[in-house]
């Protein structure tokens, strides 16, 4: 079988040296992706296209599908090579190949020609089209919007019958631009922004700020692995996880409520910038869209940018949520995003939409930056190729209850502000406040002869924290969902 790979049009207008470099990188990417299906396949570079030849016919569907997901490819033609002697011979072979497909249909013939022949493309279109019209009584020619387009390619003394055409995702080949680090949360925005930079030729590494224990990290790892495996498996990338709970705890205790959101984002940018510098990455990528939430006003985005000298790319800055979700659906990350947890521990009750630099710097003056340095130094760096095996491990399920016994203790793990706004008052049971960001350090000090039921408003943070405690060896925890 043979595939003709047509280049993304922007590649074809580059200078000769740049064009050749892009084609070489794309050829290598194609070979890296497809070798898992057929190690004997051949990838041949040409000035205006790339040929892929494979021997195993059983792999035709998966190879064709994989090609549609490699950045840099405009479309793919599945072709059958044949010899020809003259223009009439071309017609005879086309009639043989297309007769059944054209019966009762409108059609047109489109020809692309390379090399030296004694006819031009229009000659072939007229001759073959007229012949098909005469020999297939139920078919008729229609040059605009036909039901079937008969595509032929002629190169020197070879005729290529186009059996199928598939659209690619376009863009530049991965690796033609420099590396970036995507701040991924597993939601709609960060997945789409990562995809858009991959499609623009960047090798995208992933940085995840963990606020919810191992269960949340496993979910985000799955999203990152899916994006890499689907659109950029030709290149090795990193997945870096940073335990950010200590940072959140410090912010909740030391920073004024209205400034928390901007300060948290600035801390994330600082941490990600250190990671980027460590691995020689040129820019950060976020899924922020102008005005979507309080921290994403122009004023606040500018202050967030000022936290670091590292370039921050925001490919979704002018996109609305509906369009972002549509793209997530198209690339296959929608289901991941819909099930990704949103935490009950809201970082700020009354966030500012127009932060003042002096005020932010004053609040950050109360922050212990040694905590930020520590979590960055302890960041976990994983080769994304190993994630597939790791995520197959089952996350231990924690028991959820709607009722309690008198000898059990309800742990209200919401933030202090949430507890003040909506106090949890229950009769015949002890209710003990212990914010989620203190659980990892203070749960071990509690009376371990008792069973603790973790409570938060939506039940997501409580479940993830219970999973984390189970992983640490504590078996006396459940989730309370009244």
From Swiss-Prot:
**In which family does this protein belong, per the annotation?**
Belongs to the ThiI family.
Protein name (record): tRNA sulfurtransferase
Looking up SUPFAM superfamilies in the UniProt record yields:
Adenine nucleotide alpha hydrolases-like, Rhodanese/Cell cycle control phosphatase, THUMP domain-like
Q: Which GO terms describe its biological process?
A: thiamine biosynthetic process; thiamine diphosphate biosynthetic process; thiazole biosynthetic process; tRNA 4-thiouridine biosynthesis
Q: Which biological pathway? A: Cofactor biosynthesis; thiamine diphosphate biosynthesis
**Quick one: which residues bind ATP?**
183-184, 265, 287, 296
| Rhodanese domain: residues covered | 404-482
- Source species taxonomy: Bacteria, Pseudomonadati, Pseudomonadota, Gammaproteobacteria, Enterobacterales
Task: Fetch the CDD domains from UniProt.
Answer: PPase_ThiI (cd01712), RHOD (cd00158), THUMP_ThiI (cd11716)
Sorted alphabetically, the keyword list is:
ATP-binding, Cytoplasm, Disulfide bond, Nucleotide-binding, Redox-active center, RNA-binding, Thiamine biosynthesis, Transferase, tRNA-binding
Quick one: a GO cellular component term? cytosol
One annotated GO molecular function: tRNA-uracil-4 sulfurtransferase activity
What HAMAP family does its record include? ThiI
Q: What is its EC number?
A: 2.8.1.4
Subcellular localization(s) per the UniProt record: Cytoplasm
Which reactions appear under catalytic activity for this entry? [ThiI sulfur-carrier protein]-S-sulfanyl-L-cysteine + a uridine in tRNA + 2 reduced [2Fe-2S]-[ferredoxin] + ATP + H(+) = [ThiI sulfur-carrier protein]-L-cysteine + a 4-thiouridine in tRNA + 2 oxidized [2Fe-2S]-[ferredoxin] + AMP + diphosphate; [ThiS sulfur-carrier protein]-C-terminal Gly-Gly-AMP + S-sulfanyl-L-cysteinyl-[cysteine desulfurase] + AH2 = [ThiS sulfur-carrier protein]-C-terminal-Gly-aminoethanethioate + L-cysteinyl-[cysteine desulfurase] + A + AMP + 2 H(+)
Show the stretches that span the lipid bilayer. Answer: none
The THUMP domain extends over: 61-165
Signal sequence segment: none
Gene for this chain: thiI
**Alphabetized PROSITE patterns for the sequence:** RHODANESE_3, THUMP
Q: List the disulfide bonds.
A: 344-456
Residue positions of the active site: 456
- Does this entry carry the keyword tRNA-binding? yes
């Amino acid at each position: 079988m043979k595939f003709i790979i047509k280049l993304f049009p922007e590649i074809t207008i580059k200078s000769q040296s740049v064009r050749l470099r892009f084609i070489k990188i794309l050829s290598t990417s194609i070979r890296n992706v497809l070798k898992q299906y057929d190690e004997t396949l051949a990838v041949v570079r040409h000035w205006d296209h790339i040929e892929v030849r494979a021997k195993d016919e059983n792999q035709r569907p998966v190879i064709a599908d994989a090609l549609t997901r490699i950045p840099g490819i405009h479309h793919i033609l599945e072709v059958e090579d044949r010899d020809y002697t003259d223009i009439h011979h071309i017609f005879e072979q086309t009639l043989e190949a297309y007769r059944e497909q054209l019966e009762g249909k409108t059609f047109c013939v489109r020809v692309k020609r390379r090399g030296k022949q004694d006819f031009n493309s229009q000659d072939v279109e007229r001759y073959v089209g007229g012949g098909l019209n005469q020999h297939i009584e139920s078919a008729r020619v229609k040059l605009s919007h036909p039901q079937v387009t008969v595509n032929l390619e002629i190169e020197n003394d070879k005729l290529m019958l186009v059996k199928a055409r598939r659209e690619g995702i376009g863009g530049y080949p991965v690796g033609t631009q420099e590396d970036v680090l995507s701040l991924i949360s597993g939601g709609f925005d960060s997945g789409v922004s990562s995809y858009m930079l991959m499609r623009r030729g960047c090798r995208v590494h992933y940085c995840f700020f963990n606020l919810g224990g191992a269960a949340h990290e496993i979910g985000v790892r799955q999203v990152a692995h899916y994006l890499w495996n689907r659109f950029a498996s030709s290149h090795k990338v990193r997945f870096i996880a940073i335990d950010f709970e200590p940072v959140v705890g410090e912010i909740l205790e030391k920073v004024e409520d209205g400034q928390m959101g901007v300060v948290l984002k600035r801390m994330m940018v600082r941490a990600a910038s250190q990671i980027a510098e460590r691995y020689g990455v040129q820019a950060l990528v976020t899924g922020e869209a102008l005005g979507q939430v309080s921290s994403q006003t122009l004023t606040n985005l500018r202050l967030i940018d000022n936290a670091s000298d590292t370039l921050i790319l925001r490919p979704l800055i002018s996109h609305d949520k509906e369009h972002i979700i549509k793209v997530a659906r198209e690339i296959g990350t929608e289901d991941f995003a819909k099930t990704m947890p949103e935490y009950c521990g809201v970082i700020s009750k009354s966030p500012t939409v127009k932060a003042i630099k002096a005020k932010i710097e004053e609040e950050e003056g109360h922050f212990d930056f040694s905590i930020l340095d520590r979590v960055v130094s302890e960041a976990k760096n994983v080769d994304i190729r190993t994630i597939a095996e790791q995520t197959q491990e089952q996350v231990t399920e924690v028991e959820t209850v709607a009722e309690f016994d008198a000898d059990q203790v309800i742990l209200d793990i919401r933030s202090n502000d949430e507890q003040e706004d909506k106090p949890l008052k229950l009769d015949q049971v002890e209710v003990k406040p212990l914010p989620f960001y203190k659980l990892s350090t203070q749960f071990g000090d509690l009376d371990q002869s008792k069973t603790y039921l973790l409570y938060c408003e939506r039940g997501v943070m409580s479940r993830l924290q219970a999973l984390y405690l189970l992983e640490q060896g504590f078996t006396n925890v459940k989730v309370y969902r009244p």
